[in-house]
Amino acid sequence: MAGHTEENAQLLSTEQESVSRHSSDSAASTASTTSLVFDRIGERVAANRSEKSMMVTPKFPPRGEMAYADDEHTQIHLDEEEEKDYDLEDSAFLTNGATNKSVDKKLRKLIWIVGGVFIGAWVLALFIFLGKQAYKHSSEIPHDPQATSSRGNGKKVTMDQVMGGQWRATKHSISWIAGANGEDGLLLEQGSAGKDYLIVEDVRTQNPETVGTLDRMTLMKDGSFTVAGRSLYPSKVYPSKDLKKVLVATDVQSNWRHSFYAKYWIFDVESQTAEPLDPVDLDGRVQLASWSPKSDAIVFTRDNNMYLRKLSSPTVIQITTDGGPEFFYGVPDWVYEEEVFAGASATWWDDSGKYIAFLRTNESEVPEYPIQYFVSRPSGKEPLPGEENYPEVREIKYPKAGAPNPTVDLLFYDIFKAEVFEVTIAGGFEPKNLLITEVVWAGSTGKALIRETNRESDILRVVLVDVVAREGKTVRYTDINKLDGGWFEVSEDTRYIPADPANGRPHDGYIDTIIHENYDHLGYFTPMDNPEPILLTSGNWEVVQAPSAVDLKNNLVYFVSTKESPITRQVYSVKLDGTDMKAITDTSNEGYYGASFSKGAGYVLLNYNGPGIPWQKVISTPSNGNQYTHTIEENKGLAEMAKKHDLPILIYQTVTIDGFELQVVERRPPHFNPKKKYPVLFYLYGGPGSQTVSKSFNVDFESYIASNLGYIVVTVDGRGTGFIGRKARTIIRGNIGHYEARDQIETAKIWASKKYVDASRMAIWGWSYGGFMTLKTLEEDAGETFSYGMAVAPVTDWRFYDSIYTERYMHTPQHNPGGYDNTSISNVEALSKNVRFLVMHGVADDNVHMQNTLTLLDKLDLAGVENYDVHVFPDSDHSIYFHNANRIVYDKLNNWLINAFNGEWLRTANAVPLQIDAAKV
């Protein structure tokens, strides 16, 4: 089987190389076809000579076989063979050797004349082709919705390039930092060539034509330092606000997706020396450490207990004492890290440096899930004698849907009184029905905003706490079931706006994302306890991770939105009274922008992510009197690479299903020929609020499939995905997978009806939620549209996934048992009607447990269903990287798909034993 695949790959490579000369331009097409005829004749002559001398049968593929590998060349190849079946031994095209004597001179003269005419026409067509610049790569041509052909004549995208990151745009992250005296436009640079190891620099000095207001300041001269005879090397650095000290993390060891353990040191900028964070415990595994806003103290968590180190003393103060395996202080447990904070911290300083808010998490009732490691020992511990041959098991407190959640409390610590206290607010959720999703201090006022939801995330409560008075009240309460029946997403974008009467802000307030007429928009709540916002944005579009920044001096709010299109991103500003909205980016040209603003919002790093070659530029914002612009990355190397390669043709369009307009991108192979029949691969993720179709530049595995293998790849963002309004998003609640699968199937039927699509060769693939959607689509479709599917790390029963994520979209299993039954992959009879499908999973997946795949396999076994393949990866988590596993995943997807579209799985389904003639043995 491997040899057969290898042979197909070699033939595919040879034929696509020839086909790269073909173009939709008529002149180019003439040139390419003519040269292809002569090339083929030349190849046959050479092959004939070689094969005759070796006395073997010629190895050209039988007629029609290569249709599976390269349809475009097959079309030309078959047409030529049907017109004339050349006998190579007696061919008039042989110009030397014995057969040349038998060729009639007149015939030979006629052949030379005809050949000369063909060559002359070929040269003329070539000049026309070059004159029209038809050789330009499609990446240089704006996206054309009506485009049917690439004009490239370059190399194919390779798997090695994609896997090696060669198509990844170079991006520079700027760590904006506020100056000790409030200066704006300062950035932190670590490890830049030709500079001290850690410096603070005015961004304007990056452009040699401008002068910054701050001289470069060195925080750490060298990339190493010594403490008690130890040589230490920084992994992470955190300067104090006054820039006099640096908190340095070394010996970092990963924990979960975001969290890690490290040893911490306090580095003095003036003396360039360091001391341990805790002089008594130099080797303590610290989970989190953060500076006081006043630069005079550091709070940290070690072994799930909280501690305080004041710089005025080497003594460490222990804040909590009962932390351990079941109680967490200041750091989240697994599910809060993964699904709520998307980070490792549950500690918040107020601006005055007087108070610390922190989360206490009680996991005592949360069931454990065992993660087994058969090859490695992530704990770093040596096994006990006699247990060397047993796998290491890590027990994780993992609340599955309907199981007990961790209970959380928000506690406060008074620095000066050395006192921990809690503020109780009447009318709150029961502890088992409470999620605390955001904490925002109101500057130095001693007040904090706390965002809470119920367990199913459909009731929101915003609480305002006064820690000085130790009292609080509910300032907003929203039951979304009365609005659109959806859910509240976890958000940490609330921005506090301090009062400034002289600047038109008589009261303090905050900006938050709100639901307005079916879309996510920005609202400004002022005073803080006002439940009715000033509407800052409105319309049939949405804000994205907003606000991005607030310019308090000029009362401006900056944000990114989908105003121009659901699949693009532009940057805007709006005044705090909701007027004068302006674009910061050029909206006359489509673009997918990201933005990172300086601390005072006077400067912004613009990230242009597509559809063209990405670039980065630092500019001053419109309200900044000092106009500044500096390009820091153009990705010229990537641009040159794109010119030399045949990239897929991207066709953006929409489909309307059940009244919903959905975004689609079709990746066509270079040199697309609408007269041919192409196999089609659907790729999806499809998770709630996600987006896969966008105008960002991306050369990925799907690009490789289209460019190298010559298949069409289609992605549709169905119902449930983001940025097309809440009506389309929330319709899936309580029954995830149903509408999403329908949208994939109906879109696939549209493609199957196209003249250039081979409806018998359609496949679908996805990872994680996309793996679930792949199986759900195959189940719903039952072989009617899709013949093949490839699912990586799929959820197969939402009862097995974590509670906070799942119940947000499905309610609890106790509340919605029928919905959970419907969403599970259980109709194995329907799966048996597909030609074949593939499932892959990491054995040590702590996110989507291997339990999902194993229970599906059991259902298939019980029903006697065998039309599938399985590959598991020992010790790999959800990303599947352990011991070269990630490359194996994509190699497997690649080879499995080629075999599918070559018809191998049809032959496998009806296996016939090879008959051997005993007389010839």
From Swiss-Prot:
Stretches of the chain found on the membrane's Cytoplasmic side: 1-109
Enzyme superclass (EC): hydrolase
Topology feature Vacuolar, residues: 131-921
Residues at the catalytic site: S768, D845, H878
GO terms, molecular function: aminopeptidase activity; dipeptidyl-peptidase activity; serine-type peptidase activity
TM regions (residue ranges): 110-130
Membrane topology field: Single-pass type II membrane protein
Subcellular location: Vacuole membrane
UniProtKB keywords: Aminopeptidase, Glycoprotein, Hydrolase, Membrane, Protease, Serine protease, Signal-anchor, Transmembrane, Transmembrane helix, Vacuole
InterPro entries: AB_hydrolase_fold, Peptidase_S9_cat, Peptidase_S9B_N, Serine_Prot_S9B/DPPIV
Chain spans, region Disordered: 1-33
EC assignment: 3.4.14.5
Catalytic activity, reaction form: Release of an N-terminal dipeptide, Xaa-Yaa-|-Zaa-, from a polypeptide, preferentially when Yaa is Pro, provided Zaa is neither Pro nor hydroxyproline
Role noted for this protein: Type IV dipeptidyl-peptidase which removes N-terminal dipeptides sequentially from polypeptides having unsubstituted N-termini provided that the penultimate residue is proline.
Designated name of the protein: Probable dipeptidyl-aminopeptidase B
Annotated organism of origin: Sclerotinia sclerotiorum (strain ATCC 18683 / 1980 / Ss-1) (White mold)
Organism lineage string: Eukaryota, Fungi, Dikarya, Ascomycota, Pezizomycotina
